[in-house]
Amino acid sequence: MFYYLNGTITLLDANLAVVDCGGVGYACHTTNYTLARLQLGKSAKLFTYCNIKEDAFDIFGFSTREELNCFERLLGVTGVGPKAALAILSVVSPEQLTLAVMTQDDKTITMAQGVGKKLAQRIILELKDKLLSLIHI
């Protein structure tokens, strides 16, 4: 859809940032890590993922491409939707997620709300060969 939004941050809330781009406010669901980097009234660039469903159009925004790439890889795991992927990246950085996957540390992944042991183990199994190339640790 669109790769990023570049504009002024007009609202910050729990896992939500609104970016004003040319007079249009785009609500972006985001992680705690991205929220910590944003400031009200300041310019920001968020890399985006658009989730279009029959009854909704959701935008997910990330401060780095690495975070966006990890989000997209998580969505490729059976049983992981946008909310679970966002929850995971709200408690671990892309680097921490990669380390958890490489060391088969399912406890780190289960720190995310709504992610149990079985799903964490599936994430490890399905992402073991895919995550290392996405980030620089």
Regions found by a protein language model. Name each.
Residues F57-G61, P82-V101, R122-S133:
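Amphipathic, charged-and-aliphatic alpha-helical interface segments
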